[in-house]
Amino acid sequence: MVYSYSEKKRIRKDFGKRPQVLDIPYLLSIQLDSFKKFTDQDPTGERGLEAAFRSVFPIKSFSGNSELQYVSYKLGEPVFDVKECQIRGVTYSAPLRVKLRMVLYDREAAAGTVKDIKEQEVYMGDIPLMTDNGTFVINGTERVIVSQLHRSPGVFFDHDRGKTHSSGKVLYNARIIPYRGSWLDFEFDPKDALFVRIDRRRKLPATIILRALEYSTQEILDLFFERVEFKIKKDTLVMTLVPERLRGETASYDIKDAEGSVLVEAGRRITARHIRQLEKTNTTELEVPVEYIVGKYAAQDYIDPDTGEVLVSANSEISLEDLAKLSLAGIKELSTLYINELDHGAYISDTLRIDPTTNRLEALVEIYRMMRPGEPPTKDAAEALFQNLFFSEERYDLSKVGRMKFNRRLSIPDDEGSGVLSKEDIVAVMKNIIHIRNGFDEVDDIDHLGNRRIRSVGEMAENQFRVGLVRVERAVRERLSLGDLNELMPQDLINAKPISAAVKEFFGSSQLSQFMDQNNPLSEVTHKRRISALGPGGLTRERAGFEVRDVHPTHYGRLCPIETPEGPNIGLINSLASFARTNSYGFLETPYRKVVDGVITDDVEYLSAIEEGRYVIAQANIEVDSQGRMVEEQIACRHKGESTFMRASDIQYMDVSPQQIISVAASLIPFLEHDDANRALMGANMQRQAVPTLKSEKPLVGTGIERTLAVDSGVVVAAKRGGVIDYVDASRIVVKVNEDELRPGEAGIDIYNLTKYTRSNQNTCINQRPCCSVGEPVVRGDVLADGPSTDLGDLALGQNMRIAFMPWNGYNFEDSILISERVAQEDRFTTIHIQELSCIARDTKLGSEEITADIPNVGESALSKLDESGIVYIGAEVKGGDILVGKVTPKGETQLTPEEKLLRAIFGEKASDVKDSSLRVPNSVKGTIIDVQVFTRDGVEKDKRAIEIEEMHIAQARKDLGEEFKILEEGVLSRARNLLLSAGFTEAQIAALPRKDVLVQVIDDETKQTELEQLAEQHEELKADFDKKFEIKRRKITQGDDLAPGVLKIVKVYLAVKRTIQPGDKMAGRHGNKGVISKINPIEDMPYDEQGNPVDIVLNPLGVPSRMNIGQVLEVHLGAAAKGIGNKIAAMLEDQREKGLAEVRSYIKQVYELGDEVQQRVDIDSFTDDELLRLANNLKGGIPVATPAFDGAKEKEIKQMLELAGLPTSGQLKLFDGRTGNEFERPVTVGYMYMLKLNHLVDDKMHARSTGSYSLVTQQPLGGKAQFGGQRFGEMEVWALEAYGAAYTLQEMLTVKSDDVNGRTQMYKNIVDGNHQMQPGMPESFNVLLKEIRSLGINIELDQE
């Protein structure tokens, strides 16, 4: 493998055995691609904004004299960029402008004669835009729109599993689900009649809908039944025989063949053998006794040819009298319906009998009554209602997906078709459900991923936009019908408010628009790849049963079977598997390698769940020889959702990678294959809660996906193009781009500005640090700067800690964790948290609030950290209760006492008419002010601090743009100098030229002169561009802010809090092994090895066997080996000054070559000495290794690594007790494990209260830290005290410490008086109970004797 210069800095040794056929696709593409489809202009008009406009326009007036047509749309440029939107608290969006054409027709002239056409661009609201990282900035906060897994439109057949009826009979049903419009259900009742429901309303006999579709009884019977033909002879009937129809019946008469010999005697059951005999003898007619026809149903109406009287109506039961009538009327032939109990039920026939309607109008009226009960039906209204239900394109749409699913399920060959239903569609569904009831077909599995599809951002935004447009359409239609249209323009007809409101509501408050989880890069990526079955149009937690939540065979390679939340949402929220993507219909697909005649090819094809069922697919870990031919005889594979064994020649596809079935979070767990699934689930979920530490450290034992994840998440800065690093400082990196990657006429410079110390959604710190130096070559995709939780471009969520598995004096009982003081001293788990506190000055009824340092009744010391505007200085260290922003609020006028009047006369007005409402630091917080921002409403005078901040921002902008200009100018000038050199100027001449003269030299060579002139033009453009950019920036900084109504000023103060690790913090490994720190032990008391090195953390070995997450033990062993190898390299580097690099080179080479069939090839010999030295220095702390899930390091390889590191292959060491110096009685497993500090910090949870706020009705203390509440003393706690007979303790708990109002105030008094007695009274909750009983009308009074 070829490594770039920056990748050579640290290479992760990979134990993977399988060749990487396919790289993991870009992880955020599900979000970005979907939204791109929404905003991109689509000429076909099938999706996105274009589709929404085309579906609503043109809007015609009621009279038809005018219409509003849609021409095209364009999205403008956003006013602020993403960072500015976050700071100002506004939405990152672009204005949508639509070109509309208003056409007026001439009433007098012929139809369609145009009188006037007006075209105009109309503003239609703002559309939020997606940032490059797949998020939206809504009101200044980053949000993610989670994709939804919903039931695909189409037709589904199901049954009730025998739960509806007490008899346990299975009742089948069919449901046509459109993308939008009314649902149509067909269902059987226990008596086997077929019913229809529209939108889950009351049921009607199913034949009503057929009558409404203009089918007569005769046509209905012909659609659903075969006929049996009889010829009427004097006293017998001759039946046309179809032998197959007799199977399973009991013969009620002798069945004879053409010769008259008896084949089946009366009373015998007719079997397949008899039928074969009948077919052999070619018997086509059979004489049957007259009684045979009794009880059968006529297939058509029989009419007396003379009188026209109906003798036997269609679908009526035939009796002997009817037969006699027919004979009399001279009717010689009779058709009946072919019905048998087994597989040709009389369902439609029975349904027709209970159908009250006889013609189309009655059927329409019946449907109208069901849909609109209580309204008097008219013919037109009934027709219009039925037409609009399923046959109108405005009200009903199956969508492309729905039509495809519908046609495939009903075996209609074409995948395309109309979005509305046809008569044939409805009949086909009814035929199919009868087919299923007859036992010829199976019901569908609704949890199959072929029946559930993904709805992503773009599609949901389009739907919301369409909802807004439909609201506008109604208003436009009314306006077109009113008033004089000659004066009006399209602008006057359209009100953009409903559209903006619909879009805003979706992005701001939809259940699927979520506050982004920004704990660390992994949590961001997982949140964007999340697939939820909840939300509008989806399931609800309460209704979702076990089947929906369970892992389904079709999840393989599409949804992760491991990563899902614990708790009520389990199985309803899933994560996309690593390689999965959605196809054009919205179904999930996963890639497979094609296999031809037992040989694996490199062709990769994506298959959806529907397609996958047809093929035989082998797993990725099968054995193959060097030619890619399968070795084994029988190969484990999947076919039609079942696992089975097949021959190599039968296999058609094979998985692309063993990690294909799991999500990115799960594939970050090394040795996942050795962990129990429940613990792996916890491990995957807890990695998302890891807080970025002060100094990130790459995991020694990883899985090889860390780099992909860090780069795709967007928290690191990756090079857009190759080149050489030209300049680096803490906030900017400049890359001089390679000539061959430049576009013509472009300055060859890329500037990357870094994000410094900003706050994330979870209050953690986002900070980017450069990890490259000047002069280094870079290629596209190289990591230039690390973000939070990344280390040299690798995801680094925690720290590598030296761990011992042993008990230690009960301090690691029940998953507690004992850590060494050294961990705290070295700041290994120190994290920075940034809090944003805001102070808002409003305009109140009594006057406006004011931000000022002149606060009544506050001492000088409290104001020491404020400037003259009353705002805290940057860099001030503050603690709980300190004033951050001084603010005073006008107080209502009260009647003044004479003393107050005197004070007023002496001290002036100010002192009393305002009250202090300053912003103070919350109680438990202590930290440093790192930033202050002041937002002032337009027209309100800015204070001194606001002006200072503005000037600082302007100066910064000038400096940034100036430096950018300088760098770009230098790029242009250096190219001009090169040009002059090539044209014959000497270096001395060029050096002597002033900067401004370089571009105005005269060259004899004409082409070079033109080139120089082009460069001069480019320079002018740069200058103009700089002035323009600076002016825009300056205007943005100085303009007033758009604040909420009634708000004059907002001051935001950012407070950085440094949190060291302490007892009570929650930590975890990557295998679901979580625990709480119980004690921070002095270094000298920790167990140490024979070299005197103490361990960092002591874990309880009892946490491993019962939880079956053995992966952590293997990780510890491999971690020990990786660290040991690092120590050896460090020792060799110490010696290399004398011995040279040969030893280091051969040792590193040995390490990278270790292992069986390992795919990775690192050509250490091709490294220069400098490169090798840099690599070796980066490996000193331990060589990072990758052990991919299901394809990782084997036990043998771990032992080889331990040997290379010079450690015992058992992975166990002798340890000594730090307190006594005695050796522990047996060797202990010691090694390195990657530990994470989770965002459950004791500082955020610790809380105490003596007195505080009380609930209004019950008068009991509130609950929770946020309300400064008390601890709940519930019924179980009451039982505990009762069990001990602690009557007085119980009494005070239920009275004075809770809701005895008088008792608790009396307690104060008693304590002050030194009288430690309590007088419990009546608890308020008792009075509440009395009042509740009285509200029932029962007078209850307390007798206090």
UniProtKB/Swiss-Prot annotation:
GO terms for cellular component: DNA-directed RNA polymerase complex. Its EC number is 2.7.7.6. InterPro entries: DNA-dir_RNA_pol_bsu_ext_1_sf, DNA-dir_RNA_pol_bsu_external_1, DNA-dir_RNA_pol_su2, DNA-dir_RNAP_su2_dom, DNA-dir_RNAP_su2_hyb_sf, RNA_pol_bsu_bac, RNA_pol_bsu_CS, RNA_pol_bsu_protrusion. Keywords: DNA-directed RNA polymerase, Nucleotidyltransferase, Transcription, Transferase. Gene3D superfamilies: 2.40.50.100, 2.40.50.150, 3.90.1100.10, DNA-directed RNA polymerase, beta subunit, external 1 domain (2.30.150.10), DNA-directed RNA polymerase, subunit 2, domain 6 (2.40.270.10), RNA polymerase alpha subunit dimerisation domain (3.90.1800.10), RNA polymerase Rpb2, domain 2 (3.90.1110.10). It catalyses: RNA(n) + a ribonucleoside 5'-triphosphate = RNA(n+1) + diphosphate. GO terms for molecular function: DNA binding; DNA-directed RNA polymerase activity; ribonucleoside binding. The keyword Transcription applies. DNA-dependent RNA polymerase catalyzes the transcription of DNA into RNA using the four ribonucleoside triphosphates as substrates. The RNAP catalytic core consists of 2 alpha, 1 beta, 1 beta' and 1 omega subunit. When a sigma factor is associated with the core the holoenzyme is formed, which can initiate transcription. Belongs to the RNA polymerase beta chain family. This is DNA-directed RNA polymerase subunit beta.
